[in-house]
Amino acid sequence: MDTHRADASQRSQAPAARPRHAVHSIDHYALEVPDLAVAERFLDAFGLTVARTPECLEVYAADQRCWARFYEGERKRLAYLSFSCFEGDFAGIRQQLAASGATLVEDPRYGDESGVWFFDPDGNLVQVKIGPKTSPSSKSPARLEGAPGGQRGAVVRSQVQRVLPRRLSHVLLFTPSVQRALDFYRDALGLRLSDRSDDVIAFTHAPYGSDHHLLALVKSSARGWHHAAWDVADVNEVGQGASQMAKAGYTQGWGTGRHVLGSNYFFYVLDPWGSFCEYSADIDYIPAGQAWPAGDFAAEDSLYQWGPDVPEYFVRNTEA
């Protein structure tokens, strides 16, 4: 654990028994929102590519992969969350779902019926299907900062390029019970605890090589969608993304700062529905097979190392 990571009040976390089978990636997430035109403007300003289909908006990052779908609905909510697994894990995951008491869904509302669909303990619709690993298999390269003596270290403002996120990094869900959700995603889908802060927030990773968190869970009075995080090259792109969104009229958010759990640089942009999109750079990476020393951190050491004060609306669940 490096000196950037708060550890003075870290309490050891005994590992739970690990299931044999696990997902390896988030394939994509899907939201329902009241107005797709509003969603398209926001996502385009953020630096993502949006394609309209007869059913929804498909959202692509710079890697030209569809990471999200937006459907029209009465209000903003998570439509579903889709995970991918290797073929050799699929049957075992189905058995783990049955053992965990998951409610299977035979006829999901959405077009893709592949894999297995079910509700998690909070009532979120989830899909697991066989697919290629799309989570990184090594730490995403970050640009080196600084310039040698005798050279300029920054381009002029007029030459700053538009920030285009490289890929989806992770998502965070509100849950009435962090421990219950953590137990389910561990026992049913094989996700492993990375770090936590009591029963307030927990971060999980996939065992096949994963960012520090693939799925995060935070305490609320109800289920809900908090944010999706998108990987960018460095802290400059985090700050440039904040400026890019402010210029487009999206001025509310939190950052720029640096997290403790995950260590990533961040800026969160408030979206039109009260949740967030995050620019994220240089997040910790957990290689396949590595035993990560999961910690239980005090509240004051669990959120950020530096940055502006947290706005009140950052922890508001607009779906509660």
From Swiss-Prot:
Listed GO biological process terms: catabolic process
Chain spans, region Disordered: 1-21, 131-153
Binding positions (Fe cation): H170, H227, E278
EC number: 1.13.11.2
InterPro entries listed in its UniProt record: Glyas_Bleomycin-R_OHBP_Dase, Glyas_Fos-R_dOase_dom, GlyoxalaseI/FosfomycinResist, VOC, Xdiol_ring_cleave_dOase_1/2
The protein's required cofactors: Fe(2+)
Stretches assigned to the VOC domain: 25-131, 167-282
This protein's UniProt keywords: Aromatic hydrocarbons catabolism, Dioxygenase, Iron, Metal-binding, Oxidoreductase, Repeat
Molecular function per GO: catechol 2,3-dioxygenase activity; ferrous iron binding
Catalysed transformations (reactions): catechol + O2 = (2Z,4E)-2-hydroxy-6-oxohexa-2,4-dienoate + H(+)
Name of a matching Pfam family: Glyoxalase
Entry's family note: Belongs to the extradiol ring-cleavage dioxygenase family.
UniProt name for this protein: Metapyrocatechase 2
Organism this protein belongs to: Cupriavidus necator (Alcaligenes eutrophus)
Gene: mcpII
